[in-house]
Every structure is written in C-alpha cells, then in structure tokens.
C-alpha cells in the first residue's frame, strides 16, 4: 500500500484542501490540513472545529405539513400508495439550501395518478432544493393532493412535540445539520524537541453546503464566540432592556460542605484536630498557616473562604470533603 504524501509549510501556519469529492447530490466529502502546529494545538483546534461543524452551523428543513386530505399521521389515504407517516418521513429527508431568516411557506399541489418528488414543491425565492428527484409520494388514482409546508432555518435538532389534529397540521422532526459527520486526526513530524503537528479534518455534508463552506462557517462561528474575550472587561455593566440578571450558582462543592455541617455535631468537631484527618502535607500546611487547627475551625469556613487561602485550590476542597465524608 502506497502511503500518501502531502506538502506542508514548516514556518507559516496554513491550511489547504487535500481532497474534495461529490459522492452524490446529497453527499459531499472534503479533507483539509492545517500546519505547522505545536504539540497539543492540533487536538485543541480539532475538538473545537468538530463541535462547531456539527452543532454551530445552521440548516434549512421542512418542519410542518398541513393537508385537508390527512386525518392523522398514521392513517392511509385512498389513492395514495404511502401512509401519511411515510410521506412525513419523506418530507423530513428533503435537503434544502437557503439564506432565509425566520419561517417561510411552501406548497405541493398535484393531481394524480403519478409520482410526487421534491421537484413538485413550490418554494419561496430564497430557498432551493438540492436533489429534485427525492421521492415524496405515489398517487395511484386521479385525486388532488395539496400539502402546505412550513420551512425554517435553525441549528441542531427540532423534535416534534404534539400533533394539531384540529387544523390538520403535523410537525416534522427536523435535523438542521448540513454537516453529517466530521473527524479529526493528528500527524506528528520532526525530530527531538522540534516536533510539530499536522491537523487533518474530514468533513461530510448533505450537499446544502460544501465541506469548504462548512469549514469557513464553523471557523467564523468560533471566532465570534471568542471575540468578547478580546475586549476589556467592563467594571460597571449597565443592563439594557433586553437583558436580565441571573443568580450565579454556588461553587460545585458548596452543597456537600453544607450537608456535612448538618450531619456532624459541633461538639465533636472542636475536639478533632486536623492532624488526625491524614490530609496531604500541602493542604495541612495551608490550613495551619490560616489558623485552622480543628475540624470545627475548618467547617466554620465557607468554600469561598477556603479557596482564598494562599496556595489553596478548589480541588483541595474536594479532597477534604472526600476524607471527611468517610469519617
């Protein structure tokens, strides 16, 4: 087997596409590299990019169907080969491309007999179908079938909650994910202490975006998430009308500390010295320097007080709690 070779930059950080193909109208593949990276950077970028590719990119889907011909979504209609459930599943698989915001309406209005495909959907100007041949239903008799559709642009998943039988309107599970899969791998090269890394990114899309477009959009979304950290922190924040205040949760071990105080008796605490707790030397020395000599002294300090002690960490609170809960 011949091993593939790629040319990479050894000084300037660069990316390039090393493979791109279209397997079908609804399956695109792209492979990209980014180099040179220092040890550990490739994994950091790869994990972030994969999550952004799968979760941060918006897609367009049919989310609702309405028809006077449909009594309920598990029924069969005379003159139509497929069940209503099968038609809704077929609509769920239609791949759309758009730059719309909010929702739009579309329509299918066909007279049988004949096949209904994605080509028969009457779309708003801002939406296009990726594969016009996608099957929707088969009309076996000369009947009229009209289905009103709702189209939305969003990200992630939208699972149908309930059916509205009164207006013959049925929600459709939507997967707003143009990227079907994304993987990353790392290749190290170089000698000794000068080892560097190449990040390989593989992206599969449904055709509504090319892998290169998906890579650009995921990168922009990540940049937008990190931009606020580049700004100087405002000491005084004035809330606008569209903002609200939230109560911050306690630190993770606060509840355990409170429960421990309730379970133990204070009288016993004052006679238990921290020397008896078999604490790690560093934690023991930190507590001693802060005049914490007994278990009562220790539990009279809140978690916030403890982590203010010099060289004391939040992990140390966890260690102390683990030891005390075993006593």
UniProtKB/Swiss-Prot annotation:
It catalyses: RNA(n) + a ribonucleoside 5'-triphosphate = RNA(n+1) + diphosphate. It comes from the Eukaryota. InterPro entries: DNA-dir_RNA_pol_insert, DNA-dir_RNA_pol_RpoA/D/Rpb3, DNA-dir_RpoA, RBP11-like, RNAP_asu_C, RNApol_insert_sf. The keyword Disulfide bond does not apply. Pfam families: RNA_pol_A_bac, RNA_pol_A_CTD, RNA_pol_L. GO terms for molecular function: DNA binding; DNA-directed RNA polymerase activity; protein dimerization activity. Keywords: Chloroplast, DNA-directed RNA polymerase, Nucleotidyltransferase, Plastid, Transcription, Transferase. One of its GO terms (biological process) is DNA-templated transcription. SUPFAM superfamilies: C-terminal domain of RNA polymerase alpha subunit (SSF47789), Insert subdomain of RNA polymerase alpha subunit (SSF56553), RBP11-like subunits of RNA polymerase (SSF55257). Gene3D superfamilies: 5' to 3' exonuclease, C-terminal subdomain (1.10.150.20), DNA-directed RNA polymerase, insert domain (2.170.120.12), RNA polymerase, RBP11-like subunit (3.30.1360.10). The N-terminal domain is essential for RNAP assembly and basal transcription, whereas the C-terminal domain is involved in interaction with transcriptional regulators and with upstream promoter elements. Belongs to the RNA polymerase alpha chain family. DNA-dependent RNA polymerase catalyzes the transcription of DNA into RNA using the four ribonucleoside triphosphates as substrates. This is DNA-directed RNA polymerase subunit alpha. It comes from Olimarabidopsis pumila (Dwarf rocket). The lineage of its organism: Eukaryota, Viridiplantae, Streptophyta, Embryophyta, Tracheophyta.
């Amino acid at each position: 087997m011949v091993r593939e070779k790629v040319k990479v930059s050894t000084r300037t950080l660069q990316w390039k596409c090393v493979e791109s193909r279209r397997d079908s109208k609804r399956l695109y593949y792209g492979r990209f590299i980014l180099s040179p990276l220092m040890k550990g950077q490739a994994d950091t970028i790869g994990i972030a990019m994969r999550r952004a590719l799968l979760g941060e990119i918006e897609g367009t889907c049919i989310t609702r169907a309405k028809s006077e011909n449909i009594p309920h979504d598990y029924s069969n209609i005379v003159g139509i080969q497929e069940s209503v459930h099968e038609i809704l599943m077929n609509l769920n698989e239609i791949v759309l491309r758009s730059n719309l915001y909010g929702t739009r309406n579309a329509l299918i209005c066909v007279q049988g007999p004949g096949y209904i495909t994605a080509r028969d959907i009457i779309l708003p100007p801002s939406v296009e179908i990726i594969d016009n041949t996608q099957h929707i239903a088969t009309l076996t008799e000369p009947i009229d079938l009209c289905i009103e559709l709702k189209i939305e642009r969003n990200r992630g998943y939208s699972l149908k909650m309930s059916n509205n039988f009164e207006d013959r309107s049925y929600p459709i599970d939507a997967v707003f994910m143009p990227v079907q899969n994304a993987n990353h791998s790392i290749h190290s090269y170089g000698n000794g202490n000068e080892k560097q890394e190449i990040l390989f990114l593989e992206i599969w899309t449904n055709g509504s975006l090319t892998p290169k477009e998906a890579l650009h959009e995921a990168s922009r979304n990540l940049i937008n998430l990190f931009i606020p950290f580049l700004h100087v922190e405002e000491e005084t924040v004035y809330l606008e009308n569209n903002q609200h205040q939230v109560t911050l949760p306690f630190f993770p071990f606060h509840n355990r500390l409170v429960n421990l105080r309730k379970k133990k008796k204070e009288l016993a605490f004052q006679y238990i010295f921290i020397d008896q707790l078999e604490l790690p030397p560093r934690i023991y020395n930190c507590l001693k320097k802060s005049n914490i000599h007994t278990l009562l002294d220790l539990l009279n300090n809140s978690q916030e007080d403890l982590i203010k002690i010099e060289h004391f960490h939040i992990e140390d609170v966890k260690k102390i709690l683990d030891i005390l809960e075993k006593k």
